[in-house]
């Protein structure tokens, strides 16, 4: 059975981060379920730049599924929606407590994970302009940060979304599959470490 990913979407989510991650996971053979965290339960999500995405289901219907990872795209308005959703916050906490992977990109780490103190010891990165919202002892200025101690994956923004997606494939389907997907994307040799 292939790995299962739950990708959360909210009004104002950053579309490049969401779509790139979803696309790469599917290419990597990972089954993706998209969940709307919109307060009205609407499945049509208007992202940060006006792109509309259609979620598979409201989070309330899929939160208890058997997923290996939960993914939180950035976009400040979307991340604020995540932060303000008791169901989303509790779902992320459940993933963490059960030893499953939590992945957050861009504004999501500083806006969702830190205020709710979900990872008090996890190393993380995020959107550089929000660096001051992440405790200095946890901040790493890297494109992608994987903290295996707490199963936390974080990344910086739209320009790091491919790296983020490939790291998720590496974690769920193996390095060989990540290399295969990187090759399909015509990634320049030397830019991404799956070519090493």
From Swiss-Prot:
GO cellular component, one term: cytoplasm
TM ranges: none
Pfam family, one: DJ-1_PfpI
List of catalytic residues: 106 (nucleophile)
Residues found modified as Cysteine sulfinic acid (-SO2H): 106
Top-level EC class: hydrolase
Top-rank taxon, per record: Bacteria
BP-aspect Gene Ontology terms: DNA repair
Keywords: Chaperone, DNA damage, DNA repair, Hydrolase, Oxidation, Stress response
Post-translational modification: Cys-106 is easily oxidized to sulfinic acid.
Catalysis performed (reactions): N(omega)-(1-hydroxy-2-oxopropyl)-L-arginyl-[protein] + H2O = lactate + L-arginyl-[protein] + H(+); N(6)-(1-hydroxy-2-oxopropyl)-L-lysyl-[protein] + H2O = lactate + L-lysyl-[protein] + H(+); S-(1-hydroxy-2-oxopropyl)-L-cysteinyl-[protein] + H2O = lactate + L-cysteinyl-[protein] + H(+); N(omega)-(1-hydroxy-2-oxoethyl)-L-arginyl-[protein] + H2O = L-arginyl-[protein] + glycolate + H(+)
EC identifiers of the protein: 3.1.2.-, 3.5.1.-, 3.5.1.124
Gene Ontology molecular function, alphabetical: protein deglycase activity
Subunit composition and interactions: Homodimer.
Family: Belongs to the peptidase C56 family.
Function: Protein and nucleotide deglycase that catalyzes the deglycation of the Maillard adducts formed between amino groups of proteins or nucleotides and reactive carbonyl groups of glyoxals. Thus, functions as a protein deglycase that repairs methylglyoxal- and glyoxal-glycated proteins, and releases repaired proteins and lactate or glycolate, respectively. Deglycates cysteine, arginine and lysine residues in proteins, and thus reactivates these proteins by reversing glycation by glyoxals.
Protein name from the UniProt record: Protein/nucleic acid deglycase YajL
Lineage: Bacteria, Pseudomonadati, Pseudomonadota, Gammaproteobacteria, Enterobacterales
Gene: yajL
């Amino acid at each position: 059975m292939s790995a299962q990913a739950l990708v959360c979407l909210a009004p104002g989510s950053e579309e490049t981060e969401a779509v790139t991650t979803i696309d790469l996971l599917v290419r990597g053979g990972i089954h993706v379920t998209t969940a709307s965290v919109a307060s009205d339960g609407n499945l049509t999500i208007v992202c940060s730049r006006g792109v509309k995405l259609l979620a598979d289901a409201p989070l309330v219907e899929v939160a208890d599924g058997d997923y290996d990872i939960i993914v939180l795209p950035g976009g400040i308005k979307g991340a604020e929606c995540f932060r303000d959703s008791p169901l989303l916050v509790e779902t992320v906490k459940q993933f963490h407590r059960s030893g499953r992977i939590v992945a957050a990109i861009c504004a999501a780490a500083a806006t969702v994970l830190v205020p709710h103190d979900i990872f008090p010891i996890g190393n993380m990165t995020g959107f550089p302009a929000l660096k001051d919202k992440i405790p200095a002892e946890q901040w790493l200025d890297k494109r992608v940060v994987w903290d295996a101690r707490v199963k936390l994956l974080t990344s910086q923004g739209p320009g790091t979304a491919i790296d983020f997606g490939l790291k998720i494939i590496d974690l769920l389907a193996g390095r060989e599959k990540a290399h295969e997907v990187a090759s399909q994307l015509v990634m320049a040799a030397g830019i991404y470490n799956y070519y090493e």
